[in-house]
Design a protein with these regions (language model features):
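A short acidic, Gly/Pro-enriched loop at the edge of an enzyme's catalytic core
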Residues: 115-122
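A conserved beta-strand element that flanks and buttresses the S-adenosyl-L-methionine
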Residues: 124-126
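Class I SAM-dependent methyltransferase "Motif I" SAM/SAH-binding loop
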Residues: 53-55
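Conserved class I S-adenosyl-L-methionine
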Residues: 1-45
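A short glycine-rich, Lys/Arg-flanked "PGG" loop and its adjoining helix->strand segment in the class I
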Residues: 139-151
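SAM-dependent methyltransferase
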Residues: 156-215
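C-terminal lobe and adjacent flexible extensions of AdoMet/dcAdoMet transferase-like proteins
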Residues: 215, 219-247
């Protein structure tokens, strides 16, 4: 029997499948909005938020709807195209056409290596996207983020703390399943989305929240909040949101 062809999850049709599953996932969103509301200095009110690995806008759109101005970046042109379509669709359905588009600038950028002359009141790296990066790339992402923050600005990063080992498969919907293959010794995690006869893969790294905390400390950022939420679908998984402030 022939093995199924594994296509990338974040490009082509995979990007559309990912968006279809993630669009209604509100994990982290309330915490991120609460963090911005409670921890941002009023002195930074005129500055924008930089979002890394924004994908199809799962976090971008709620931040914009809350009144924030955002530079939304991602390395996947396909994901950014989905985001642009969503912005246009939501704008056309409101009484204030163009309102979201005025608050969101969409730009292609690599989260592990970027440089903007603009300084931001917050840099947001949600959806455990940091797990797509190896150790060197992760350090690059955090260093670039720290440089991009205005004094007093916030770095908001999410990851997964995982104690499980081996392979787990969960059914998301009839005909749609997610398989996770974990290798704790190598620090690797492979996610395979099966959508009918289609298969999409994402090769990830295990990035414990302690690693991010230590890296932030070395960059002279102060951890001000840590939220851990057990994953109800995956055993021995917890989603962690870390918030660090630049002096």
């Amino acid at each position: 029997m022939r093995s199924p062809v594994l296509s990338p999850l974040y490009s082509g049709l995979g990007a559309q499948r990912y968006h279809a599953l993630s669009a209604h996932d509100d994990t982290e969103i309330a915490l991120i909005l609460e963090t911005l509301e409670n921890h941002l200095s009023p002195d930074l009110a005129d500055l924008r938020i930089l979002e890394l690995a924004c994908g199809s806008g799962r976090v971008t759109l709620p931040m914009a709807e809350a009144g924030y101005r955002i530079l939304a970046t991602d390395l996947s042109p396909d994901m950014l195209e989905v985001l642009r379509s969503r912005i246009a669709e939501q704008d056309s359905a409101t009484d204030a056409p163009g309102d979201l588009a005025a608050r969101i600038e969409v730009q292609e950028a690599d989260m592990s290596s970027f440089s903007f002359t603009e300084r931001f009141k917050a840099v947001c790296l949600p959806t455990a996207s940091i797990t797509q990066l190896d150790a060197e790339q992760r350090l690059g992402a955090l260093e670039c983020s720290a440089r991009s923050l205005a004094p007093g600005g916030l770095l908001i990063v999410s990851t997964d703390d995982i104690a499980a080992e081996g392979t787990t498969t969960i059914e998301i919907q009839p005909g749609i399943s997610l398989t996770e293959e974990l290798d704790q010794a190598r620090g690797r995690r492979r996610s395979i989305l099966r959508w009918g006869e289609e298969c999409y893969v994402s090769e990830l790294h295990l990035v414990p929240s302690s690693w991010i905390s230590e890296a932030c400390t070395r960059l002279r950022l102060t951890i001000v909040e840590r939220h851990s939420t057990p994953d109800q679908a995956m055993p021995d998984h917890s989603g962690v949101l870390l918030v660090a402030r630049k002096p």
